[in-house]
C-alpha cells in the first residue's frame, strides 16, 4: 500500500526499490523505467538543482570517465543490438555527453582543443594537480595485448602524454598529484560477466608491458629519468577504496621510482569489487575496503560502503597525509608521506 501511494504521489517519476539489510531503499529518478538520457537536456534537467547547491558550498574540479557516456565506452562499443538506444553512434553519444559535461562543469577552454578535459590546477608552491582524460584518446577496448605502441594501444594518446611529461617536468611544486580516471594495476574487464577484453590499463597477464601498459611504462620511465619527485596518483572508476604502493622490486617492469596510488569511490552508487591486481608494475596492496564474498556485489549506499579521501599537506614539514574515509566520516586508513628533495 505504501509503495502504491508513493507511486501515485510522484506521478511521472520512476520508482525503483529493493530490499537491503531488511530495509526498504527507495530511489527516484526523473526518467521513465526504460528511458535513457541520450540528449544533453535530460541530464542537465535532472542534476542542475543539486549541482548548483553543491557548487555554492565547495570548490569542485571534475574529470570524466565512462559513465558520462555509457559503461566502458570506447570506439569498439557496439549498440546495434541494444534496443535501449535509438542513437547507435558512439561518437555522437560521446559528443552529446561532452557538451553536457562542459555545460555543467565549466572548464577553462584550451584554444588549440576546445572541450579538452586534461589540465593542471596549481595550489601554490606545495601542490600541482594534473587531471587526466583516459577516455577521449584511447584506442578501442580489446584484449590489450599489443606489442607495439600505436594509437590503437594507447589510453592517454600522444598529445596528452606529451603535455603531461612537459607539465610534470616544468612543475616547481613539492607534490605532483596525478588525478587518473582509472587505476594503473587493477584489472577492469570490458565484459565483466565473460571476463574478456580490457577497459583499463592492465591486461591481467602479470608480465612485461603490453597494450596500454606500454604507454604507462614509458611515462613512469620518463618520471624516473627526469628526476621528477613526489608524484602521487589518485583514482577511482572501481567502486571501492584501496591504497596501492608500486614497488619496482616486485614488478615485471622495474624502470621507475616507487609511488603511491589511492583509490576512493563511490560516493553514492553501487559498491563492487575487489578487482584483481596485475603485477606488471609491482603494486602492493596496503589497504582495501570492499564488499565481502558474503555481502555480494552492487551493494546500495545504505550498506555504508561509500568512500572518499582527504589529503592534507603541512606548510611546515611539507608532509602529505592521506586518509581514506567512509561516508560516516570514519577514518579507515591513514599514511603520512615524506617529501623527497626535488632534483
PLM regions: where:
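Metal-dependent phosphoester/phosphodiester hydrolase catalytic core
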Residues: 1-343
